[in-house]
Amino acid sequence: MILGLDVSTSIVGATVLTDCGDVVFCEAWDLRNKNHFPTLYEKAQRVKQMLEILHEVKRYNIEHVFIEQSLQAFRPGFSSAKTLLTLAKFNGIISYICQKCYLKPPEFISASTARKACGIKVERGKKAKEVVLNFLLDNDDTFSVEYTKHGNPKPGSYDRADSYIIAKAGWTSLNS
């Protein structure tokens, strides 16, 4: 089985695929509550608990873990250097937890490489997260999204979609 993770400090998307590439689990783990998760370490502890549930309770025999590679370059108008550093730090903590839980180091896939492996093309000026979500809604009957009263995807929808694409790209690389 394959685990794909979209790691961020607010919501972590997680998707588990069978060896045939079928989705058996696709969730978003919400870490935004500052009372429950005041530091990166409480957030990491929650992710660890969820990974242990996949491993010990759901009994998914995860043999490969793929994690979306964190951004490595500062670009004006996007995330600040501090935000990128925090994300990279959290990504490292989660990577270590995955290695300890599944006894194998995770593999990293960039978002653009994952989209390309899944046949998703993002036109200039379009938001990649929206393109990915719409691609899945149009092409996979098993993927669904709940919407807010204003018609926007509920929090976690984009994270689930991204983890799905990371898992599928990992599956594709293993089967090519």
Please provide the spans of the model-predicted regions.
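Phosphate- and other anionic-substrate recognition elements at nucleic-acid/protein interfaces
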Residues: 1-176
